[in-house]
């Protein structure tokens, strides 16, 4: 079984390299850019030949669908540029893919906000459904707050290891 790490991006040069460094182990990396004017695409091309640009923005859901359509691997791991896969999460993902049992897997996301990780007030674990078999699940058409759809009723399983989310650097970014 093979795995594609998939990202949709726009002007993420400040985050992208650190994110992609944590995904080098993936069989395939797919980056769909929404029309960046910084060095996002140049950085992405250092890690993969599968960098496409589609600036016809119709929302996060549609953009994720477009990125999913570029995947050749058996499994999809959807990651945002401001996220990092820890070694523990990588091991958990690889074990799930090796088992090959169709399921949607949730990842425990740990958010960094204003200089520290937030582990309270419902912020952790912020479980996000991001690992799924290609063609058996996919994103809705939502403009924002897109959701992974599970039309076949696949089981939902929880993985171990954190997905680090470097969200708000300071109040200006909040």
Language-model regions: role of each:
Residues 14-17, 38-47, 88-89:
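Acidic helix N-cap motif at the loop->helix transition within catalytic regions
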Residues 41-70:
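Conserved donor nucleotide-binding strand/loop of the catalytic core
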Residues 61-68, 75, 86-174:
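Catalytic-site signature of metal-activated, phosphate-bearing donor transferases
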Residues 2, 27-28:
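Residues at the starts of beta-strands that form the adenosine-phosphate
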Residues 1-22:
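N-proximal low-complexity "stem/linker" segments adjacent to membrane-targeting elements
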Residues 22, 33-43, 56, 80:
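A conserved acidic beta->alpha catalytic loop
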Residues 25, 47-48, 127, 152:
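Short, structured coil segments at secondary-structure junctions
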């Amino acid at each position: 079984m093979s795995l594609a790490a998939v990202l949709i991006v726009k002007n993420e040069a400040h985050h992208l390299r650190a994110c992609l460094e944590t995904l080098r182990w993936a069989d395939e990396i797919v980056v769909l850019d929404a029309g960046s004017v910084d060095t996002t695409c140049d950085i992405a091309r250092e890690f993969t030949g599968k960098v496409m640009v589609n600036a016809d923005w119709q929302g996060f859901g549609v953009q994720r669908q477009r990125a999913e359509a570029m995947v050749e691997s058996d499994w999809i791991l959807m990651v945002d540029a401001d996220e990092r896969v820890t070694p523990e999460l990588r091991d958990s993902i690889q074990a799930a893919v090796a088992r090959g049992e169709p399921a949607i897997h949730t990842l425990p996301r740990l958010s960094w906000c204003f200089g520290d990780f937030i582990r309270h007030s419902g912020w952790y674990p912020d479980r996000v459904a991001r690992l799924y078999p290609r063609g058996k699940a996919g994103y809705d058409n939502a403009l924002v707050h897109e959701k992974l759809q599970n039309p076949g009723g696949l089981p939902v399983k929880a993985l171990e290891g954190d997905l680090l989310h470097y969200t708000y650097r300071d109040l200006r970014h909040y």
